[in-house]
């Protein structure tokens, strides 16, 4: 009989607990439910606005990336040939020296002149131009490299006296400075 009492007592406890649960889960009033839904809607609206803002930022980043890549491609096309041109310049210098030091006018000298002219013409098509540095030109460290100084009464101080080696530009960007001597006061 004790066992029956004990079982019935446990059964009563379970019944009380289930009634408490039922009491807790009573239906919410319509006004409270509407308020909850409005709050949830407002939260989702904020989340949506944040996601839209994030989307716009990512899209702008992508557009900036595309522009940067396009600019880099243009730079590569414009200056990508720089290495090979720098390697060709010493051969160009040697052709000029050969013409300058030729003792006679011969077919070989004329052939070297023609070769030099063709090479300069081809380089010009790719945007290569010599740095114009006649004697008397003011020394410009952006385009000239001073190899020495010479006292001169004939020339203004800080002007080019002689050019040892021509300088070259590639699309207005310096490839190699002109090697020059510079006048100083006598």
From Swiss-Prot:
One of its GO terms (molecular function) is protein homodimerization activity. It is found in: Cytoplasm. Residues 1-29 are annotated as: Disordered. Transmembrane segments: none annotated. InterPro entries: GrpE, GrpE_coiled_coil, GrpE_head. Keywords: Chaperone, Cytoplasm, Stress response. GO terms for biological process: protein folding. It comes from the Bacteria. GO terms for cellular component: cytosol. Its main location: cytoplasm. The keyword Thylakoid does not apply. Gene3D superfamilies: 3.90.20.20, Head domain of nucleotide exchange factor GrpE. Participates actively in the response to hyperosmotic and heat shock by preventing the aggregation of stress-denatured proteins, in association with DnaK and GrpE. It is the nucleotide exchange factor for DnaK and may function as a thermosensor. Unfolded proteins bind initially to DnaJ; upon interaction with the DnaJ-bound protein, DnaK hydrolyzes its bound ATP, resulting in the formation of a stable complex. GrpE releases ADP from DnaK; ATP binding to DnaK triggers the release of the substrate protein, thus completing the reaction cycle. Belongs to the GrpE family. This is Protein GrpE. It comes from Geobacter sp. (strain M21).
């Amino acid at each position: 009989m004790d066992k029956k009492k004990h079982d019935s007592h446990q059964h009563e406890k379970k019944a009380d607990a289930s009634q408490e649960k039922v009491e807790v889960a009573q239906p919410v009033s319509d006004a409270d439910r509407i308020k909850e839904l409005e709050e949830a809607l407002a939260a989702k609206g904020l989340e949506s606005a944040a996601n839209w803002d994030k989307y716009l930022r990512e899209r702008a980043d992508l557009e900036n990336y595309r522009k940067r890549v396009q600019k880099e491609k243009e730079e590569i096309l414009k200056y990508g040939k720089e290495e090979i041109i720098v390697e060709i310049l010493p051969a160009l210098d040697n052709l000029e020296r050969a013409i300058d030091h030729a003792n006679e006018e011969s077919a070989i000298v004329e052939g070297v002149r023609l070769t030099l002219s063709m090479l300069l013409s081809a380089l010009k098509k790719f945007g290569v131009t010599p740095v114009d540095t006649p004697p008397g030109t003011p020394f410009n460290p952006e385009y000239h490299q001073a190899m020495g100084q010479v006292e001169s009464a004939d020339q203004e101080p800080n002007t080019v006296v002689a050019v040892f080696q021509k300088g070259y530009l590639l699309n207005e960007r310096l490839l190699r400075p002109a090697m020059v001597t510079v006048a100083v006061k006598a």
